[in-house]
Amino acid sequence: LIAIREQGFPRAVRLTRPDQYKEVFADARRVGDAGFTLLVRNNTGQGPRLGLAISKKCARRSVDRQRIKRNVRETFRVHRKDMASVDIVVMCRPAVTAWDNAQMQASLERFWARLSTSCENP
């Protein structure tokens, strides 16, 4: 039961307010590939937090936007215990809508692995 709580996705690990998003957009490192752009900013010790900015410009259909969000949240949830205290905003590119779930998850897992190794000594 304890392991389930540690791998949950509570409100504390999400960016929820516009001012939190503004801080990340104003001062962040960018990393990206063909499907995603991640904005990463060190935070003040609150642990890793995730924000999603999946626009209609990227994925026209609501079903596609929700599938992208679901994959991002799930991979973040599994990997967040290995990450340093960073705020992350994930944005997508139009190419990602043609990807299947396995391709999306593989791309995101590469980002999470890079973040866990590059953020150990910020």
What annotation goes with each model-predicted range?
Residues 1-122:
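Positively charged, solvent-exposed patches that mediate nucleic-acid binding
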